[in-house]
Amino acid sequence: MSDEGKLFIGGLNFDTNEESLEQVFSKYGQISEVVVVKDRETKRSRGFGFVTFENPDDAKDAMMAMNGKAVDGRQIRVDQAGKSSGDRRGGYRGGSSGGRGFFRGGRGRGGGDRGYGSSRFDNRSGGYGGSSGSRDYYSSGRSQGSYGDRAGGSYRDSYDSYATHE
């Protein structure tokens, strides 16, 4: 399926659901799918979603008309989901599912996620890492790439090489 008529909707009120989103956007054309992305554990909205129109031209109209408008009291951002600014979409995908996988791996290693959480305090996580050899490698690999890791792009590189050190 093509992403042509698919719009990314960001900045949603956490109370906004599929029905209210569909109500707001349906005046621009026939909608084939509305998704509000929810947290798997808490089932609460994560503040963004997608609206897919049958006709890509309707999606463009909706994007022009709704970007920056308020829905349920919050200003939303509307963007095409599939175009080259889709690296934003990649960021969300990577940040949610990829990030969760990263934590899962960390937890299995006995608290590797602590290093991830405190990566801002490099000296502190360095202190943690001193006790075990594998952790040492983990923090040193981290210090050079902590920016990319957070963006959701290059964390996979350090994660993959991390896995081969077992």
Swiss-Prot record:
The keyword Amino-acid biosynthesis does not apply. GO terms for biological process: cell migration; embryo development ending in birth or egg hatching; gastrulation; mRNA stabilization; negative regulation of nuclear-transcribed mRNA poly(A) tail shortening; neurogenesis; positive regulation of mRNA splicing, via spliceosome; positive regulation of translation. Induction: By tcf7l1/tcf-3. One of its GO terms (cellular component) is cytoplasm. Residues 92-115 have a biased composition (Gly residues). Its main location: nucleus. Pfam families: RRM_1. In adults, most abundant in testis, ovary, brain and liver, with lower expression in kidney and heart. CDD domains: RRM_CIRBP_RBM3. Residues 157-166 have a biased composition (Basic and acidic residues). One of its GO terms (molecular function) is enzyme binding. Methylated on arginine residues within RGG motifs. Methylation by prmt1 promotes cytoplasmic accumulation. The glycine-rich domain, which contains a number of RGG motifs, is necessary to regulate nucleocytoplasmic localization. Cold-inducible mRNA binding protein. Acts cooperatively with elavl1/elrA to stabilize AU-rich element (ARE)-containing mRNAs by binding to them and inhibiting their deadenylation. Essential for embryonic gastrulation and neural development, acting to maintain the expression of a set of adhesion molecules, and cell movement during embryogenesis. Required for pronephros development. This is Cold-inducible RNA-binding protein B. It comes from Xenopus laevis. The gene is cirbp-b.
